[in-house]
Design a protein with these regions (language model features):
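Residue-level preference for long, well-ordered alpha-helices that form the structural scaffold
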Residues: 30-34, 102, 130
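Generic detection of intrinsically disordered/low-complexity segments and helix-coil linkers/edges
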Residues: 12, 28, 102-104, 162
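GT-A fold catalytic core of metal-dependent nucleotide-sugar glycosyltransferases
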Residues: 86-89, 105-179
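Charged, low-complexity surface segments at secondary-structure and domain boundaries
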Residues: 19, 57, 166-168, 182
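N-terminal anchoring/stem segment of glycosyltransferases
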Residues: 1-96
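A short, glycine-/small-residue-rich helix N-cap motif at loop->alpha-helix starts
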Residues: 94-108
Length: 182
């Protein structure tokens, strides 16, 4: 059903990465927020970041009827919007990790750091929306002379951790030791 198109896009990909999975411990209402976050953020990636960026959604869904329905909805979104890549974590396109299903799901959004075709990667949360302010900060980071390899954002007084899981990015074109893989 859903095809992994990431490898066919070629080198120098710019990716905004998200994780989507079913967690039985999460109340249905919160799951709906994550589902709404897919289409909402896809629209914002297209509108705010533009055609040069792709939204990657790393997913693993319950094999039951609810998961199959979600998968059909994801496939419909991907067929309707070429900026969405669906990445099933049980069938990734090769080394160093072909099956990430045993990896903690919130870490799946970091998988583009292992993809040699990705030159810029941003990690985001599905339950928050991309903003024009964030896009401006990313553009400033990418446009800075001698640009830093990693970019971290904190946009709230309670964001006190050095790196927030859904508010950072990395790039591989800075000439540093990790130039090929992020």
């Amino acid at each position: 059903m859903a095809m992994l198109t990431c490898p066919t896009r070629g080198p120098h990909q710019k990716v905004v990465s998200f994780t989507f999975y079913h967690d039985a411990r999460v109340k249905n209402e919160k799951q709906k927020n994550f589902s709404a976050g897919i289409s909402g953020n896809l629209t914002l990636v297209r509108r705010l970041y533009g055609a040069g960026w792709t939204m990657r959604l790393y997913y693993d869904l319950d094999p039951g009827p609810a998961g199959q329905l979600q998968l059909r909805q994801l496939c419909e979104l991907a067929c309707a919007d070429p900026q969405l890549d669906l990445c099933r974590v049980r069938r990734l396109p090769g080394r160093p990790l072909e099956d990430a299903s045993e990896v903690y799901p919130l870490l799946w959004r970091f998988l583009p750091t292992l993809d040699p075709q990705v030159s810029v990667f941003l990690s985001r949360d599905l339950d928050s929306r991309i903003t024009a302010r964030e896009v401006a900060a990313v553009a400033e980071w990418l446009g800075s002379p001698g640009g830093e390899a990693v970019h971290c954002m904190r946009d709230h007084p309670e964001h006190t951790k050095p790196i927030m899981g859904g508010m950072w990015g990395a790039r591989s074109d800075t000439g540093g030791p990790g130039e090929y893989y992020l």
